[in-house]
């Protein structure tokens, strides 16, 4: 798990509802099956998800090695083979790309906005407030705030290309705007970047 955060989120405060764990879907790891015993290959992956099968350490017939060095794509033995490393990098990227994430939602004048504000992370509160102030001033404005960055929601391109003007507002030097340009052909947003550690 990689958690991206920023100083505004880390040092801010606000009320939130504590979730009930019972409301979340059950987590069911892909454990090894009895058929795999004595023939277990730790890097064999589920072809649909790209996830490897889990063996509980110490189980007879499922011995394997853990470590941080690159492993053979099937056996799990340490490998320095360049072709294997290339394959493993692609397999890891494909596994992440297969993670299902919800669509990004558009708030405000979602159907007819002249301007779409895009943000992520700790910028949500002040971008939402800015959108509301602009709407009060008679402007048609919408907000798309991203929670998932990799993989991006499947509707990302459709949302971003729907509006005449898109501004990506970030509390950095524009890394998310650059990432979106890389992922979406012919996407040319305006950028609003500040690195002051203060709300916009």
Protein language model regions, located:
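Flexible, low-complexity linker and terminal segments
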Residues: 2-200
